[in-house]
From Swiss-Prot:
Keywords: Ribonucleoprotein, Ribosomal protein. The keyword Phosphoprotein does not apply. Belongs to the eukaryotic ribosomal protein eS24 family. The keyword Ribosomal protein applies. One of its GO terms (biological process) is translation. The gene is rps24e. This is Small ribosomal subunit protein eS24.
Length: 98
C-alpha cells in the first residue's frame, strides 16, 4: 500500500488541515481505515488522536482509492465539530448507550 497526498488545505476558521490523498493498493483489497490512518499520520507527522478519516472511496476495476482526512489542532475542537458517528467509526470515542 502506498499513499500519495494530492492536496493539503489549511482551514484556519475550523482549526484543521484538510488532506486529500490517493491510496495505491496493487493486487490488494481496499485498505482499512486504521491502516491508512496509521500510515498517513506517520507520513505527515500528525497526532492520531486528532486525525479523522472522513472517507476512502474505491472505484470498480481500479487499484487506486481516493480519500479525505481532517487533522485538528486540538481534541476539543475535533469533538465540537465532528459528528459522533464519525468519531465512533474512527475509534476516537466510545458509543454512548441510551
Amino acid at each position: 500500500m502506498e499513499i500519495k497526498v494530492t492536496e493539503i488545505r489549511e482551514n484556519k476558521l475550523l482549526g484543521r488541515k484538510e488532506i486529500y490523498f490517493d491510496v495505491l493498493h496493487e493486487g490488494e483489497p481496499t485498505p482499512s481505515r486504521e491502516a491508512v490512518k496509521g500510515k498517513l499520520v506517520a507520513m505527515l507527522d500528525l497526532d492520531p488522536n486528532t486525525t479523522v478519516i472522513q472517507y476512502i472511496r474505491s472505484y470498480f476495476g481500479s487499484n487506486v482509492s481516493k480519500g479525505y482526512a481532517k487533522a485538528y489542532e486540538t481534541r476539543e475542537r475535533m469533538l465540537y465539530i465532528e459528528p459522533e458517528y464519525i468519531l465512533v467509526r474512527d475509534g476516537l470515542v466510545q458509543k454512548q448507550e441510551e
